[in-house]
């Protein structure tokens, strides 16, 4: 779970990209995440109206079909049917124009801001950086100021346009990742394509465990809410958690290092 951008203070957090960074919460249940968020959230957050008992959920169909593996897409449809039978309204929604560019634009912002933060140390200690971070910082140093500002302009347009999406639904429903969780030995958490847009726009989001893939590793669905609607998001996620009743545990030892 992560709240809206700025909902939890970044004081004391070493930044990766200051305009993208969020403090997130890993918890066993939605209730646990809500307790931690209540303790950490900025006290000036405005209260939000509670979410409807059975929410209106919008599936960004084109986004799903472009990036989700077949197994993940099939699982999301099964989850949507389960939620619909429990009373949720589920329909398709369209993301704003430019959604196909959001990942590239967000990565540009990430690269530049990482390069800016590390500009003092990187020339002296480049060899000490992990290869992926070294590549990230190096590539950010080559981006022009004009391109960075144009990316921020495109970001602002997309964020503003997202408000219209929530006129036809309470929350987006989509996978947490385009493929099942990768084995531990691969050393990666997977492709962030379904999560990155919400860091880019600052919208709150929450992933709910919802099943196991054919290989026994976890699957999860994700809810995305309008800005500053964390309380409503947590209410809706509690409802989804109760409806889905997912309690199985992946066979983690089978997928760890030998």
Task: Describe these PLM feature segments.
Residues 70-72, 102-112, 183-189:
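Short glycine/threonine-rich loop-to-helix capping motif typified by GTGT followed
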Residues 54-56, 108-163, 209-220:
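Short helix-loop capping/hinge segments that flank enzyme active sites or metal/cofactor-binding pockets
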Residues 70-94, 119-124, 148, 152-169:
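Acyltransferase
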Residues 106, 149-150, 154, 177-196:
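Short, surface-exposed loop/helix-turn segments at secondary-structure junctions
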Residues 52-63, 93-106, 130-143, 253:
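Flexible, acidic loop-helix segments that line cofactor/substrate-binding pockets
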Residues 161-164, 185, 189-209:
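Small-aliphatic-rich amphipathic alpha-helix that forms the alpha element of a beta-alpha
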Residues 1-65, 77-82, 86, 149, ...:
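Structural helix-boundary/capping segments
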């Amino acid at each position: 779970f992560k709240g809206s951008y700025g909902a939890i203070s970044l004081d004391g957090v070493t930044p990766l990209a200051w305009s993208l960074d969020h403090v997130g919460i890993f918890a066993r249940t939605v209730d646990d995440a809500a307790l931690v968020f209540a303790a950490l959230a900025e006290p000036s957050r405005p209260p939000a109206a509670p979410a409807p008992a059975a929410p209106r959920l919008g599936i960004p169909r084109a986004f799903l079909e472009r990036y989700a593996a077949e197994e993940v897409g099939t699982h999301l449809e099964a989850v949507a049917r389960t939620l619909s039978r429990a009373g949720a309204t589920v329909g398709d929604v369209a993301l704003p124009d430019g959604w196909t560019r959001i990942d590239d634009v967000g990565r540009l912002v990430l690269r530049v801001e990482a390069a800016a933060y590390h500009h003092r140390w990187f020339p002296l200690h480049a060899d000490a950086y992990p290869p992926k971070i070294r590549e990230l910082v190096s590539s950010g140093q080559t981006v022009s100021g004009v391109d960075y500002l144009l990316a921020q302009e495109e970001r602002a347009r997309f964020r503003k346009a997202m408000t219209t999406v929530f006129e036809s639904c309470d929350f987006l429903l989509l996978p947490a990742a385009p493929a099942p969780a990768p084995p531990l030995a691969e050393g990666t958490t997977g492709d962030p394509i379904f999560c990155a847009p919400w860091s880019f726009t600052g919208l709150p989001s929450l992933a709910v465990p919802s099943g196991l893939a054919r290989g026994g590793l976890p699957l999860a669905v994700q809810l995305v809410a309008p800005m500053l609607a964390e309380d409503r998001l947590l209410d809706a996620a509690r409802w989804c958690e109760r409806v889905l009743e997912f309690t199985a545990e992946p066979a983690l030892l089978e997928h760890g290092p030998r």
